[in-house]
Curated annotation (Swiss-Prot):
Keywords: Carboxypeptidase, Disulfide bond, Glycoprotein, Hydrolase, Protease, Secreted, Signal. Gene3D superfamilies: alpha/beta hydrolase (3.40.50.1820). The keyword Protease applies. Residues 1-22 form the signal peptide. Belongs to the peptidase S10 family. This is Serine carboxypeptidase-like 50. It comes from Arabidopsis thaliana (Mouse-ear cress). The active site is at S170, D345, H403. Glycans are attached at N263, N361.
Length: 444
């Protein structure tokens, strides 16, 4: 009996040693590795460069030289596109733990190439040689981004004719129109084959959008009449400062308004009224500060990854309340534009976008305003959202989603972007007109 006990202890010790010494699975499975990643020099800012991660199409339906290329830009200002990569629409993402990458069922690179760029310089893994090199306005943002993208295309000559679609969310509601406007107006015959612009829950015309918060939350039942008046007064302060061209003060006033709104509603996050906790973007920070992640992406181990750069945000502070609506108007006359919003977002949601849309100086606005708003259902017959489209403009309201639409509705967001790029289903094809006025243009 004593010998059996001794043998059992020895075997247990050996098994324990084997289990301790067994290699851990890699943080990044082979399938999760980017096709390419690294740095793109930015002109005219010597020593500065933009970090990128590129994922080729998984199931392309055309030869790769003809396969659409989506360029994703995060908002902020000052937030990294690696949030979009590893938390929203990339092929693998973190869901519950920073050490566990899970396959994304709604990855946007199923049919298309997908390029994430840390924009502008100084954001995420991108490098700004000095603070003076960080852009202070959208013109400079566009110049840097264009230079980086041209470098990317030159490094990959077979990509030079690929149709390019710029996409992004939140403050990229400025970046996306800015790069589109720059290419269409100043580089129409350049190396970027621009085919469309897509903005999710964007901040594009801030002075109009900031005036929608009070009425939006009031009719949602989140504040009472007295609180609505208080919010309206806070909105008016920001608007007045814009009219006086006190741009930094206007941005500060907007921040105070959003803080007031958050305190009044008591929500975990204004980005999604249904969430009990904020979005877990912190998981991406934990992921990308691990040594293996930096090695895989080709980043120096000494670089500390931050979700958003306070320095970049401060440099662009005076830009926050400036409108780029005119850039969207210019683009609509020349290329496809998709505006989509998660319906649970209180910051940059449906009402916020619809208000500035109806003020656009665009030749197709009249026809768009009478176009049918159609019900979009997913494969199971569940309502996924609502689509209104005419000419070059497609507007989509996504049910069950907040600010981060691809996070909340992965497969639906993928179906939307694929349908829009390929011109299929509700997102493409013939224009649909109705004889009665659209509900889009109600007065608030």
């Amino acid at each position: 009996m004593e010998q059996a006990t001794t043998l059992f202890i020895l075997l247990s010790t050996l098994l324990l040693a084997v289990s301790v010494e067994s290699p851990q699975p890699p943080l990044f499975p082979d399938e999760a590795l980017p096709t390419k990643s690294g740095y793109l020099p930015v002109k005219p800012a010597p020593g500065s460069s933009m970090f990128y991660a590129f994922y080729e199409a998984q199931e392309p339906t055309t030869p790769l030289p003809d396969t659409p290329l989506l360029v994703w830009l995060q908002g902020g200002p000052g937030c990294s596109s690696m949030i979009g990569n590893f938390y929203e629409l990339g092929p693998w993402r973190v869901v519950s733990r920073a050490t566990d990458l899970e396959r994304n069922p709604g990855a946007w690179n199923r049919l298309f190439g997908l390029l994430f760029v840390d924009n502008p310089i100084g954001v995420g893994f991108s490098i700004a040689a000095s603070q003076q090199d960080i852009p202070t306005n959208q013109r400079q943002v566009a110049e840097h981004l264009y230079a980086a993208l041209v470098e990317f295309l030159e490094q990959n000559p077979s990509f030079e004719n690929r149709p390019v679609y710029f996409t992004g969310e939140s403050y990229a509601g400025k970046y996306v129109p800015a790069i589109g406007y720059y290419i269409l107006k100043e580089k129409p015959n350049g190396k970027v084959n621009l085919k469309g612009l897509a903005i999710g829950n964007g901040l594009t015309d801030p002075v109009t959008q900031v005036q929608t918060h009070a009425v939006n939350v009031y009719y949602s039942g989140l504040v009472n009449a007295k609180q609505r008046v208080e919010l309206q007064k806070a909105q008016e302060i920001s608007v007045a400062l814009v009219k006086s061209q006190k741009w930094r003060e206007a941005a500060d006033a907007r921040t105070e308004l959003l803080t007031l709104l958050s305190n009044m509603t008591g929500l975990a996050t204004l980005y999604n009224t249904a969430r009990a906790i904020p979005y877990r973007t912190d998981l991406v920070v934990d992921l990308l500060n691990q040594r293996e992640a930096k090695r895989v992406l080709g980043v120096s181990e000494t670089v500390r990854f931050e979700e958003c750069s306070d320095e970049v945000e401060d440099v662009l502070r005076a830009d926050v309340m400036k409108s780029v609506k005119f850039m969207v108007e210019y683009a609509l006359e020349r290329t496809q534009v998709l505006l989509y919003q998660g319906m649970l977002d209180l910051r940059d949601g449906v009402v916020s976008t619809e208000e500035w849309m109806k003020t656009m100086n665009w030749s197709g606005l009249g026809m768009f305003s009478t176009a049918e708003r159609r019900v979009w259902k997913d494969e199971d017959g569940v309502v996924a959202g609502y689509v209104q489209r005419w000419g070059n403009l497609c507007h989509v309201a996504v049910t069950g989603a907040g600010h981060f639409v691809p996070t909340d509705k992965a497969v639906n967001s993928r179906d939307m972007i694929e349908g829009w790029v390929l011109g299929k289903g509700l997102f493409g094809g013939k224009d649909v007109k109705q004889t009665t006025s659209s509900s889009l243009y109600h007065s608030i």
